[in-house]
């Protein structure tokens, strides 16, 4: 018997992931444990920056019209979805890092760039900047929400839980009793996310 896939990421990523899973005829349980909300931000002067760093598609979805001030800069995006949304937003030059921010920073370092503006969420994990100055501009918050009753029944099915961030992994670990963890398989987007799951 194939285990159901438990998708806990916030919308719209939850529905997008579910659609891809269903295309492979996988049984899904879509239960977001977070909601992404924009936060007010003051656009910094783009002049000192040689590029923007985008580690999450949520930054592009929530930044709003002020993002237009930075479209002339090259965008460095983690993941294909983030890169696609950067192009859709109007960035003409988009460099994609397919795996994680650490590898992308290594790639950026070879270009000799010295200062980037990082559009990000309130909760961001530290990473090696490879000597590059990174100024963070918080444009969203990923806020935990109470799981519905269907969450407990989904856990009882012994699902394969997908975690798309260390924050999501930590939240899942917080909600699942230690004795129940042996019945849940985990698929993590990165080593950091797997480690955060405990």
Residue map of PLM features:
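Signature of uroporphyrinogen-III synthase
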Residues: 1-198
């Amino acid at each position: 018997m194939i285990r159901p896939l438990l998708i806990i990421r916030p919308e719209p990523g939850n529905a997008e992931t579910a659609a891809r899973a269903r295309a492979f005829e996988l049984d899904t349980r879509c239960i977001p444990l977070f909601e992404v909300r924009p936060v007010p931000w003051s656009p910094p002067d783009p002049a000192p920056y040689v590029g923007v760093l985008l580690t999450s598609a949520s930054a592009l979805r929530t930044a709003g019209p002020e993002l237009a001030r930075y479209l002339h800069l090259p965008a460095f995006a983690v993941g294909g979805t983030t890169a696609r949304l950067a192009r859709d937003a109007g960035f003409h030059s988009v460099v994609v890092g397919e795996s994680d921010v650490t590898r992308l920073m290594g790639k950026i370092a070879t270009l000799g760039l010295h200062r980037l503006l990082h559009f990000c969420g309130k909760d961001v994990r530290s990473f090696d900047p490879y000597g590059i100055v990174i100024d963070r501009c918080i444009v969203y918050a990923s806020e935990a929400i109470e799981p519905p009753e269907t969450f407990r029944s989904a856990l009882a099915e012994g699902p394969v839980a997908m975690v798309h961030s260390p924050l999501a992994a930590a939240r899942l670990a917080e909600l699942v009793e230690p004795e129940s963890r042996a019945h849940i398989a985990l698929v993590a987007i990165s080593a950091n996310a797997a480690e955060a799951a405990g």
